[in-house]
Swiss-Prot record:
Full protein name: D-alanine--D-alanine ligase
UniProt-annotated location(s): Cytoplasm
Binding locations of Mg(2+) 2: E268, N270
Reactions that this protein is recorded to catalyse: 2 D-alanine + ATP = D-alanyl-D-alanine + ADP + phosphate + H(+)
Taxonomic source organism: Xylella fastidiosa (strain 9a5c)
Name of the gene encoding the protein in the UniProt record: ddl
Enzyme Commission (EC) number: 6.3.2.4
NCBIfam families assigned to the protein according to its UniProt record, in alphabetical order: D_ala_D_alaTIGR, PRK01372.1
Pathway: Cell wall biogenesis; peptidoglycan biosynthesis
Annotated family: Belongs to the D-alanine--D-alanine ligase family.
InterPro entries documented for this protein: ATP-grasp (IPR011761), ATP_grasp_subdomain_1 (IPR013815), D-Ala_lig_Van_CS (IPR000291), D_ala_D_ala (IPR005905), Dala_Dala_lig_C (IPR011095), Dala_Dala_lig_N (IPR011127), PreATP-grasp_dom_sf (IPR016185)
Entry cofactors: Mg(2+); Mn(2+)
Main location: cytoplasm
PANTHER family: D-ALANINE--D-ALANINE LIGASE (PTHR23132), D-ALANINE--D-ALANINE LIGASE B (PTHR23132:SF23)
GO MF entry, a single one: ATP binding
Length: 304
């Protein structure tokens, strides 16, 4: 039914290790189910395989950009060769990878997202100070095109600002300085134009950083994360945010719920989310009785 399937993983982005874990999990499921599947590490290897016509479709779990699989580059490559693939197309992938442009689209459509300022990696101390004065502490500083909390800092005082900017500036592209919303962090997985139950994330540390996402064993995940009324509201918001930036197939929308007001604020969209044992899309799917194997199968079926 599927022919020869490439599981695209690894790459050279800052999220390589997570992608390798995701890809191995997906590959194991496909092989157990009798699919002729092979792993392909990175975009150059995929390009060579496509030239040689070695695969009929691609399951993309290549995370990140600049050697990753979420910035539209590899999607354009696959479309050029006429090979179907999982996840969002060129536009949805490229736009979602850029957190600044994503926020601009959401704001233009009246969708709620934290106040922000964009900065170049060469921003002067004066420009950084002006951005902070506009937003007010606390803020989050992050690379505009990275995921998995790579290069992200929470800043509560002026003396920590320079260090946070320097960390984010190690990565390619603009920096995003964003108003820090205090409250519950939630995520809504999208599968086949349907919002899965939200997950409320309860890290044991101060926040949901890289360690809490992929290494810690004590991070708690509450699913569904909200009461029925709020659950319906966040599902509508997540679907609207996903569609606004042209995404399709499957993905994940990260949201904050402000303490006190209960208001939701959109953070970002992930178009090739993790598929590790700690990953959130499999956790949400399991709440509906869908095991990891069935989830992988549903995603691959989107290429037919």
């Amino acid at each position: 039914m599927f022919g020869r399937v490439a599981v695209l993983l690894g790459g050279t982005s800052a999220e390589r290790e997570v992608s390798l874990l995701s890809g191995r999990n997906v590959l194991e499921v496909l092989r157990v189910r009798g699919v002729d599947a092979q792993s392909v590490d990175g975009v150059p290897a995929l390009a060579q395989a496509l030239v040689e016509r070695r695969f009929d479709r691609v399951f993309n779990v290549l995370h990140g950009h600049n050697g990753g699989g979420e910035d539209g580059v590899v999607q354009g490559l696959m479309q050029a060769f006429g090979v179907p693939y999982t996840g969002s197309d060129v536009l949805g992938s490229a736009l979602s990878m850029d957190k600044v442009r994503t926020k601009q689209v959401w704001l233009a459509l009246g969708l709620p997202t934290p106040r922000y300022a964009s900065l170049s990696v060469c921003a002067t101390a004066v420009e950084v100070r002006q951005a902070v004065e506009m937003l007010g502490f606390p803020v989050i500083i992050k690379p505009a095109k990275e995921g998995s909390s790579v290069g992200v800092s929470r800043v509560f005082a002026l003396e920590h600002l320079e260090e946070a900017v320097a960390l984010a500036a190690r990565y390619e592209g603009e920096l995003l300085m964003e108003q820090l919303i205090e409250g519950d962090e939630l995520t809504v997985s999208i599968l086949d134009e349907m919002a899965l139950p939200s997950i409320r994330i309860v890290p044991q540390g101060q926040w949901y950083d890289y360690n809490a996402k992929y290494l810690a064993e004590d991070t708690q995940y509450v699913c569904p994360g909200l009461d029925d009324v709020a659950e319906a509201e966040i599902a509508r918001l997540a679907l609207a945010a996903f569609r606004a930036v042209g995404c399709r197939g499957w993905g994940r929308v990260d949201v904050m719920r402000e303490r006190g007001s209960g208001r939701f604020f959109l953070l970002e969209v992930n178009t090739a989310p993790g598929m590790t044992t700690h990953s959130l899309v499999p956790k949400a799917a399991s709440q509906l009785g869908m095991g990891f194997d069935d989830l992988v199968w549903r995603i691959l079926e989107q290429t037919l």
